[in-house]
């Protein structure tokens, strides 16, 4: 049984979050949680929170055994970018893009 958890509008770029997502794809959830705990990236905390939510969803909604779960799919899509202005010299301004992403984790007992 597949169970899904999502974090939409996560305040990290999709490119940076994908580096972390690639580390745990296909792993058992216990091993994936250990990897995320010791990964020194901001995105690892965000991905770990979504993974824990997916595990809780599988346990509560589907009655799945946590020991049998593995990360079936994990993907990170781009969310909308917030445009901000940074003042520069001589009255100019640069545009800053504050990027967001949508993190999706699918756990399965197969």
From Swiss-Prot:
This is Large ribosomal subunit protein uL22. This protein binds specifically to 23S rRNA; its binding is stimulated by other ribosomal proteins, e.g. L4, L17, and L20. It is important during the early stages of 50S assembly. It makes multiple contacts with different domains of the 23S rRNA in the assembled 50S subunit and ribosome. The globular domain of the protein is located near the polypeptide exit tunnel on the outside of the subunit, while an extended beta-hairpin is found that lines the wall of the exit tunnel in the center of the 70S ribosome. One of its GO terms (biological process) is translation. Part of the 50S ribosomal subunit. Keywords: Ribonucleoprotein, Ribosomal protein, RNA-binding, rRNA-binding. Pfam families: Ribosomal_L22. GO terms for molecular function: rRNA binding; structural constituent of ribosome. NCBIfam families: rplV_bact. It comes from the Bacteria. Belongs to the universal ribosomal protein uL22 family. One of its GO terms (cellular component) is cytosolic large ribosomal subunit. InterPro entries: Ribosomal_uL22 (IPR001063), Ribosomal_uL22_bac/chlpt-type (IPR005727), Ribosomal_uL22_bac/org-type (IPR047867), Ribosomal_uL22_CS (IPR018260), Ribosomal_uL22_sf (IPR036394). The keyword RNA-binding applies. The lineage of its organism: Bacteria, Pseudomonadati, Pseudomonadota, Gammaproteobacteria, Pasteurellales. PROSITE patterns: RIBOSOMAL_L22.
């Amino acid at each position: 049984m597949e169970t899904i958890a999502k974090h939409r509008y996560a305040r990290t770029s999709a490119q940076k979050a994908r580096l972390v997502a690639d580390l745990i794809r296909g792993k058992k959830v216990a091993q994936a949680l250990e990897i995320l705990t010791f990964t020194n990236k901001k995105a690892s905390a965000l991905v770990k929170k979504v993974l824990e939510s997916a595990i809780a969803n599988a346990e509560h909604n589907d009655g799945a055994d946590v020991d049998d779960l593995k990360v079936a799919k994990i993907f990170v899509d781009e969310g909308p970018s917030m445009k901000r202005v940074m003042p520069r010299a001589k009255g100019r301004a640069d545009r800053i893009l504050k990027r967001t992403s949508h993190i999706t984790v699918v756990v399965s007992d197969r």
